[in-house]
Amino acid sequence: MNGFTTKKIRKGLPPSKIPQKPIQKPEIVLSPDEPQKKGFWKKILRFITRHFIWSAIIFVLCIGVTKAAYRVLTLAEDFSFKELVFSAFSNPLETDENGHTNILLLGTGNANHDGANLTDTIIVASIDKSSGTVAMLSIPRDLYVEIDALYGWNRINSLLELTAQQEMYDNPAITEGQAYTKGYEILTQTVSEILNIPIHYYARINFDGFTQIVDAIEGIDVDVEEALYDPLYPADDGSIAYQTFFVDVGLQHFDGDTALKYARSRETTSDFSRSKRQQQVLNAIKEKALSLGVLTSPTKLKNLYNAIGDNFTSDLTWEEIVYLAKIADKFERDHMYSWGLNDNPLSMGGFLYTPPREEGDAFSLLPYVNDYSDIQLFANLVLLHPEVHAAGTTYQVLNGTTRNGVASQTLYYLIRFGFDVVRYGNAPNRAVPITRILPLSGLLAGQSPEKAIDNDSLKFLMENFIPVGFTLNDVPTEYSPVEWESEADIVLELGQDYVDWMAQNSKYFYGNLKFTSIENQ
């Protein structure tokens, strides 16, 4: 597959004699603080708030927890909250070999909308009880996948519907519910294979559940950063007609219907812009749900429960959902992360591209490489090793060879995986045979060499992205503060051994550079 070469510069140059290009860093969105309340309702408040904090990260799953919370509240108000939560009515969640529970979260339409069973929201949430982290990875609905021999290749959002329809065609005796259960299983299996991680559960909510939840909390406030004009929004009656939807810039109050339209619209923007708006809406729901007026009101809590109704589907048992409540206290706001796959090779998660299409063909996305290997490594990194990015380590990438473009190609490569490369350029020496990795900030701070390289981010990078060279135990003269200024914690001085490694793994370096050894030029 073909890629393309781009460049991006953030700010000015350091006083070093050799130009170094600074880079724009990715942003992590975290959840807010938990409110406090006294007495019995403090216990209820803490329980529900914890799970609405989760809703900003794993919204669909939170709906199930709210459902369980209301059942606990209505069935056993006279019992101690702690006694209920830690009772035998909870079952531990399934986990992988790393102790993570991975849940596929889905958002679909409803019977009144075209494509009612298209999964337009696909998210994998990974819960690590031991470290108290929740990491979420969004998969674009337009990702092109092979469904089966009959349907061939299609967008992943159609997999559930096509599988269920095929099941009902092949087995006329089964019910529609059984057919869609099979569809959920196949979709879960497909996402698991794409990401190369086990997925233990799925959970799905539809448009009705979404709008009713917003209405149940009396609307939400959203700060609209850019005016949205969509003359092609689907009509409310589910017909082939359109309606015009417009939202102006500024703080807006949305009811359920308007919030849904704001989150769904994409005809005049893009799928990725829509994903950003969806995050805005989910955050607004969470903020409103955290307000005392909602969480301390049994009536409003009951409205939330009633809004869920049949609009929520999951293979999580009620006992497992109660177990989620049991472990909720382990998850703090600064241990919750959200990522997404996209088609911008200069951004974190930018492993996809839009192939040319014939007139009338649907928009689709494919991986830059002919397999899911880099997407799988990314999923492993962000879902199973969130501590890597939590370390906050910064890097400077330097080309120590005569091969042009090594630093810039490595820059793009590392940015796609979310590493914070603050500068890149040429090394003082352009004839470096063996890559050198300098833990600059640690050594300058007086740390021992062992302590300076004891870093989760650096360890993962050396194992998976820069698997050549060696680490330096002291700061060379050319990189001393007198001779060289760097904003980075780690300096990566790339040598000829790294160029040779690039040649063997050239498919990951988008730009079609021809890598050959210097000796063979």
Residue spans for each PLM region:
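Non-catalytic, solvent-exposed segments at the cell envelope interface
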Residues: 2-521
